[in-house]
Swiss-Prot record:
The keyword Zinc does not apply. This is Small ribosomal subunit protein bS18. Disulfide bonds: none annotated. It comes from Brachyspira hyodysenteriae (strain ATCC 49526 / WA1). Keywords: Ribonucleoprotein, Ribosomal protein, RNA-binding, rRNA-binding. Transmembrane segments: none annotated. GO terms for molecular function: small ribosomal subunit rRNA binding; structural constituent of ribosome.
Amino acid sequence: MDLENTENVENNNNNEEEVKAKGERKAHFNKELNEKDGRKKFFKKKVCYFCKNNIDVLDYKDIKLLKRYVKDSGKIIPKRLNGTCSKHQRLVTKAIKRARNIALLPYETRY
């Protein structure tokens, strides 16, 4: 009985090596499934950075933090892309506009 089990294990290992040699991938069955209908989740819900770290006051002089929410062209990234909640997105927008007014951050560039 032990010999049969060891032979089966060796055969399985050989089969896996053959599959890898052919460039095929093994199927993965540990996918996250939706609890309601059993389908695969297509996106991961983003968590607000400020809510997670209990930040209530945003300083317009904190340029390093504000640059995370501004594109290279100078546009403010919308909340659906950066994952902030509505409350903190308003605070971020206000802080960015204040920083622009004082010339700490650039306005939009078209080039």
